[in-house]
Amino acid sequence: MIDLNSRVAIVTGAGGGLGRCYARLLAQRGARVVVNDLGGAAGAVAREIVEAGGKARDEACSVTNPVEVQEMVQRTLTEWGRVDILVNNAGILRDKSFGKMSVEDFRYVIDVHLMGAVHCTKAVWEPMREQQYGRIVMTTSSSGLYGNFGQSNYGTAKMALAGLMQTLAIEGAKYGIRVNCIAPTAATRMTQGILPEEQLSLLRPEFVAPGILALVAESAPTRTILCAGAGSFEVANITLTKGLHLAGDPPSPEELVARWAEVVDRDEEMIPEYGFAQSELELNKAGYIPTQRKGT
């Protein structure tokens, strides 16, 4: 059983939808929960948790304001002594095709989704390092992983969060900090009007929330993109094909085009453990042999 009795969690965008569901489930498993959202929604969810016998407090700060975020984390540390779990869930939509989208709408979505997660993660990073324990979840999306019409701003932010997760998982490993992404599909205020009603009835937030528990548990993985919806769970991977090496100085672009099928062939596809794995693969195919160090 996943027991979070000793843990303190912050959930952003928790005034409704997925965030509310996450906060309630974390509290049911014993975590003390900071419910973050704008307006009075956070207070209502915190009261629900307390009335059900859990421990919660609300914070109405904007994740786009780094000063307010830092103050939220500091109040949490003062009251509860630690922060173990951060679920970066806050988000908005400003959907339009790229040609019709204003730069302001593009930037605003980046500010909320990406920079909001950066501000919150930055605020908890040092406390988690000091306590040698942390669980951080970024909310990515299939719109970022694969693209979606009318969501260039949203997709950009969501793919960037996957990149942020990849690096922070590497940097946090030696401090006991595990960082993952969840890519949810759920019926929320953000998806109303986008998906048909008969689909929304199957995509309840409660069917995504178990994925959050898996990603914040003691046994949580790290550097994983967990997809979740309608009670189904999958993992998305960013992979690298074996590809090919072209002789020539420089290689011929015509030969590259002619042999394109070999470049995209997914046999022996790999999941790189870190960014330099790509250059290591390419140098190896080019016949590079590292210079032996003196004395070895």
Where are these regions (language model features)?
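A glycine-rich helix->loop->beta "capping" turn
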Residues: 5, 52-55, 75-88, 94, ...
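Substrate-binding pocket helix/loop in short-chain dehydrogenase/reductase
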Residues: 97-98, 102-110
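Residue(s) in the substrate-gating loop at a strand-loop-helix junction
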Residues: 141
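The beta1-alpha1 cofactor-binding region of Rossmann-like NAD(H)/NADP(H)-dependent oxidoreductases
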Residues: 60-71, 103
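C-terminal helical subdomain
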Residues: 181, 199-292
